[in-house]
Structure formats: C-alpha cells, structure tokens
Amino acid sequence: MIKASIIGASGYVGVELIRLLLRHPEVEIVSIISSSSNQLSIDKTNPQFKKVSNLVFEEFKIEAIQEADVVFCALPHGISQEYVKIGYDIGKVVIDLSADFRYKDLQRYAKDYSQHKYPELLSKSAYGLCEINREEIKNAQIIGNPGCYPTSAILGLAPLLKNKLVDKNSIIIDSKSGVSGAGKKFDFAYSFCELDENFKAYSVTKHRHTSEIEEKCSFLFGEDLNLSFTPHLLPVKRGILSTIYANLIKKIDKNDLVEIYNEFYKDEYFIRIFEDELPELKYVRGTNFVDIGFEVDKKTNRVIIISCIDNLIKGAAGQAIQNMNIKFSLDEKMGLIMVGEYF
C-alpha cells in the first residue's frame, strides 16, 4: 500500500483528494493536515464522510508526513514551496497542486507570482500533465500538478501544435469555469447573489495561467508562441469548457482532425474524442476525463476546438492521483474510473 499525506486538506481540492484516495485500492491516507480544521474529524467538517471516514485533521509537523510515501500539497502558491522543500529534503515524493513547480522559466514564474525561493528544486521537478509528460513524471521526486485552465487548453491544442498545423500566433483560448476554481476562501465576488444568473469575464489579458499555457504550448510547438487567453466565470459549481480558435496553415477538414486527434491520443484512456457531436460539461462532471471535439470553419480556414474537464478532478485532485499512479508504476486508471454525474 502507498501511504499518503495531504497538506491543505480542508480546501475544495484537499477534500476532493481525500474523497478520491479513500476509494483507491492501493492507498492508505496516513495524515490530513489543515491548521484551520486542526483536531476536527473529516466527518464533522464534511458530513458526507459519515460512516466512510473519521480521519482527524492535524497541524503540520514533520512527524505527520514521516510515514508517507507521497505528500500531496494543496496550498496556495508561495506558501506551498516551503512544504514541498521539507518533503523533498526527507525523501518524499511530493505532488504540488499550486503553481510553484509548474514552470521551467523562472522569469515567467516571477512575473506572474513572485521570486521562487528554491529555484534549484525546479530542475528536480516535472510538469504533471500526464498525457504529455509521462516519462519525466516517472523520474521526478517533485511533480507540479498543472493548473485547471492549462489542462483543458493544452490538451485541446496538443495534437495541432505537435504536428505544426496552426499559425503559432493565432491562438485564442476562451475558457469558462465553475466557481469552485476560485477556492474555498470567501470573496464577495463569488457569493450567490453576485453569480446566480450572471456570466462574466475576468482578468482579461492578465490571468496568471496565460504564461503557463504559453510555456507548455511553446514546448510542444518547438518555438516560442504568443496566445490570447480569456477566462470567464459560469454560475455553476464545477467544470471548465474551453473554446479554442486557431488559424490552420494548410487545408484540412474535420475528418483529417478526427484522424490526427485519435492517433495522437490513441493510448490515452482519459481523453475522449467526440467525432459526431461536441462535448458538454455534464459529460465530464465528477470524472477524470477530458472531452475534446472540434469543427473546421472552411470560410476562414480556422479550427475551433471544444475541450471540457472537471476542474476539481482532471484539473486538480484527479490528475494529481493520476500522477501518483504513474510515479509508483500503478495502472494509471486506478481509483479514477468514474462515470459523469449526468444530472
């Protein structure tokens, strides 16, 4: 059995990690760490765990993670790297769900976040986008779990970038997310009366995930590229739907795209290519799947891609567990086979 600790276990992502790991046949949770819920049991703070688990939250101390083989760190950027360093120093595999270990370019990270305190650890880390970076994940002690928006966008674009089928500076990503992506901390802007029956764009031209998407897309394309990314907030709890536009550099039709995407993702269980219809949020809600569909606008020779994920699962906790499965040589699907919550 793999022994797991979760730091930052009382937030939305932390609780989702607990829920998913409890159903994993090869994992035992040995500690759940949260200063805000210290000494409370999970079935008291989250009654959905009644008769399932009575794990007790505790404050962080090295002893709390000493028994673990893997440490999941679900803390905000900046704070997280301190705990990742501690876990690394005592020989633990650390899967970090903040932005702190997603970048290879320190300047990109510093521009959108802050100066990294442990830049030497970036060379020890792998970007945890499972379908793209599997071999690096297998060999890394620190795995930087991708952001939710980047997961949806990069996987939607990867086959076209790898095959150099689009104009590298024509990419526009228009993503819509459920409110859980903002986290558990209260903010009036995310309150019911502000969101219900509303729909809005935010952080236009300056969302932090833009640089993460650009860095990874540039790697796939083999050259630096610039793109436009605009996030929107939907009045739903969970899910991301990205509509991605790019100019094709040669004449190809939808049948060609079906062949290209199916070939690129032929061995990827969690990627579902929609050939005859377009994905919807309800198909992926509660799952680790990425649903991808597309059309070609023949008038403009532009491709339009639809990419859907559950932001808390494939965009966070589920992908972190998929990374753990890869790292510990388990079946990648273990603990993650789920049918979407249709209603």
From Swiss-Prot:
One of its GO terms (cellular component) is cytoplasm. The active site is at residue 148. GO terms for biological process: L-arginine biosynthetic process. Its main location: cytoplasm. GO terms for molecular function: N-acetyl-gamma-glutamyl-phosphate reductase activity; NAD binding; NADP+ binding. Pathway: Amino-acid biosynthesis; L-arginine biosynthesis; N(2)-acetyl-L-ornithine from L-glutamate: step 3/4. SMART domains: Semialdhyde_dh. Signal peptide: none annotated. InterPro entries: AGPR_AS (IPR023013), AGPR_type-1 (IPR000706), NAD(P)-bd_dom_sf (IPR036291), NAGSA_dehydrogenase (IPR050085), Semialdehyde_DH_NAD-bd (IPR000534). Keywords: Amino-acid biosynthesis, Arginine biosynthesis, Cytoplasm, NADP, Oxidoreductase. It holds the Pfam family Semialdhyde_dhC_1. It is an enzyme of class 1 (oxidoreductase). Its EC number is 1.2.1.38. It is found in: Cytoplasm. It catalyses: N-acetyl-L-glutamate 5-semialdehyde + phosphate + NADP(+) = N-acetyl-L-glutamyl 5-phosphate + NADPH + H(+). Belongs to the NAGSA dehydrogenase family. Type 1 subfamily. Catalyzes the NADPH-dependent reduction of N-acetyl-5-glutamyl phosphate to yield N-acetyl-L-glutamate 5-semialdehyde. PANTHER family: N-ACETYL-GAMMA-GLUTAMYL-PHOSPHATE REDUCTASE, CHLOROPLASTIC-RELATED (PTHR32338:SF10), N-ACETYL-GAMMA-GLUTAMYL-PHOSPHATE REDUCTASE, CHLOROPLASTIC-RELATED-RELATED (PTHR32338). This is N-acetyl-gamma-glutamyl-phosphate reductase. It comes from Caldicellulosiruptor bescii (strain ATCC BAA-1888 / DSM 6725 / KCTC 15123 / Z-1320) (Anaerocellum thermophilum). The gene is argC.
